């Protein structure tokens, strides 16, 4: 069993911890978070320090790390932490819950989380650091851009393309062959039956431009 350290102790971390414990592949050393969280516990795990301690733990021989901060809208903290981990030399594995179904013909980038009872079907391509959350379905031949979040119970029908850092809300449905741009938010329960441009918020039939983009070079 390999050691792993987790970044961020919030609600999403609870789900990821469950999946790691279930698979039995990694031994969780603890969490890193903000100074305000130092010493706090979740189950048997403690917040050991801030992300400034990443180098120290890497030097101690811990080579695996995972970002357990959830999707933060227009923020790019997940992106920044991922880059920090890779610059130090950490491996950022995929965490796939034992109840999830992932096709052998699907492609997953680094740091993908696949939650309980989620499905990723044949020829789907999932970008680095995506979250495919509890009960979500990503059907055949879909492409999900890096740092995107397919939320609880949402359905991405066959051949759909989703851009980078886009949030597909809980129980939303994207009809087959549609394209959704980058930096979008699709509200919970929304049915997407037409293409969506970059930087759009869509709730039901209401759509507006967000006016923000994420600078991936920050």
Positions of predicted regions on the chain:
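Short glycine-rich anion-binding loops that position phosphate/pyrophosphate groups of nucleotides
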Residues: 12, 70-73, 208
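Structural signal for interior beta-strand "rungs" in well-ordered beta-sheet cores
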Residues: 94-210
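Glycine-rich adenosine-cofactor-binding loop
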Residues: 2-20
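Residues at the starts of beta-strands that form the adenosine-phosphate
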Residues: 3, 27-29, 64, 91
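Alpha-helical elements of the RecA-like P-loop NTPase motor core of helicases
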Residues: 14, 18, 76-79, 194, ...
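NAD(P)-binding Rossmann-fold cofactor-contacting core
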Residues: 23-42
């Amino acid at each position: 069993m390999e050691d792993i350290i987790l970044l961020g102790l919030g609600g999403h971390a609870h789900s990821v911890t469950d999946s790691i414990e279930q698979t039995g592949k990694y031994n969780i050393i603890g969490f890193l978070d903000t100074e305000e969280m130092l010493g706090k516990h979740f189950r048997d795990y403690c917040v050991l320090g801030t992300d400034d301690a990443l180098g120290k733990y890497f030097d101690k021989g811990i080579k695996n790390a995972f970002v357990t901060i959830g999707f933060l809208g227009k923020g790019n903290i997940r992106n920044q932490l991922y880059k920090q981990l890779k610059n130090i030399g950490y491996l950022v594995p995929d965490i796939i819950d034992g109840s999830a179904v992932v096709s052998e013909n699907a492609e997953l980038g680094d740091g993908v989380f696949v939650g309980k009872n989620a499905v990723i079907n044949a020829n789907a391509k999932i970008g680095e650091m995506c979250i495919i959350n509890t009960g979500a379905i990503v059907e055949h031949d879909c492409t999900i851009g890096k740092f995107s979040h397919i939320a609880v119970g949402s359905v991405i029908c066959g051949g759909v393309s989703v851009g980078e850092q886009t949030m597909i809300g809980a129980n939303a449905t994207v009809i087959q062959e549609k394209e959704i741009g980058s930096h979008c938010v699709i509200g919970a329960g929304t049915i997407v039956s037409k293409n969506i441009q970059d930087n759009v918020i869509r709730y039901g039939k209401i759509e507006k431009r967000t006016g923000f983009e994420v600078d991936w070079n920050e």
